[in-house]
Amino acid sequence: MASLSRPSLPSCLCSFLLLLLLQVSSSYAGQFRVIGPRHPIRALVGDEVELPCRISPGKNATGMEVGWYRPPFSRVVHLYRNGKDQDGDQAPEYRGRTELLKDAIGEGKVTLRIRNVRFSDEGGFTCFFRDHSYQEEAAMELKVEDPFYWVSPGVLVLLAVLPVLLLQITVGLIFLCLQYRLRGKLRAEIENLHRTFDPHFLRVPCWKITLFVIVPVLGPLVALIICYNWLHRRLAGQFLEELRNPF
């Protein structure tokens, strides 16, 4: 009976290493990385914007918890849990404005759509995926721009003046041409009838020509300037209102 062999040290060591390897591999089996856009996403005030997010390696995320929040106070922008959108957990300023696009959630890809973009939406967003106790996240940035950011007063005046100048030159040339033809025609008729012709008869005062050309020009220009100022005041008022009442 003394000849019964005990487990050798190498075999015990191999079993221990195999068990350790299985535990490590099982612990890493559920891990993944969350990937978001590397560059800032740009949107215009009042438009829609989409914030994409995915996990790598790709896997079915239907049973995971997926969401977006805004640092630093972790305001919930959108939350997906237990296969449903949890609208009750949203921050008040995002209720009714977000939609989670889940067409590719089986591949671990989702997109958050935000409607009616506001100035207050500018800044950082964080997307996260949670699988049981394991969670990973990725940060992204949204840039909100004024739809009329390129319209400076100088550009507006230039856009208004160029067509006006062309219109003024065209109207002036047409007016002079008609006046010349009319004077020539009347002169010929008067000479044929042997009547006295007064060269000042068809001469139009300069102030009348100026009034005839300038008045139609100033009207559209003034209207454009008023429209520009109204739009900027409206956008500025919306921005200040969002700052006063963020929720």
Curated annotation (Swiss-Prot):
Family per similarity comment: Belongs to the immunoglobulin superfamily. BTN/MOG family.
Function: Mediates homophilic cell-cell adhesion. Minor component of the myelin sheath. May be involved in completion and/or maintenance of the myelin sheath and in cell-cell communication.
Extracellular side: 30-154, 232-247
InterPro entries for the chain: Ig-like_dom (IPR007110), Ig-like_dom_sf (IPR036179), Ig-like_fold (IPR013783), Ig_sub (IPR003599), Ig_V-set (IPR013106), IgSF_BTN/MOG (IPR050504), Myelin-oligodendrocyte_glycop (IPR016663)
Gene: MOG
GO terms assigned for molecular function: signaling receptor binding; virus receptor activity
Known glycosylation sites: N60
Protein name as it appears in the record: Myelin-oligodendrocyte glycoprotein
Disulfide bonds: C53-C127
Subunit structure: Homodimer. May form heterodimers between the different isoforms. (Microbial infection) Interacts with rubella virus E2 glycoprotein.
Residue stretches spanning the membrane: 155-175, 211-231
PANTHER family according to UniProt: BUTYROPHILIN, MYELIN-OLIGODENDROCYTE GLYCOPROTEIN
Biological process terms in GO annotation: cell adhesion; central nervous system development; regulation of cytokine production; T cell receptor signaling pathway
Ig-like V-type domain sequence ranges: 32-145
Signal peptide: 1-29
Lineage summary: Eukaryota, Metazoa, Chordata, Craniata, Vertebrata
Keywords: Cell adhesion, Cell membrane, Disease variant, Disulfide bond, Glycoprotein, Host cell receptor for virus entry, Host-virus interaction, Immunoglobulin domain, Membrane, Receptor, Signal, Transmembrane, Transmembrane helix
Highest taxon above the source species: Eukaryota
Ranges in the topological domain labelled Cytoplasmic: 176-210
PROSITE patterns: IG_LIKE (PS50835)
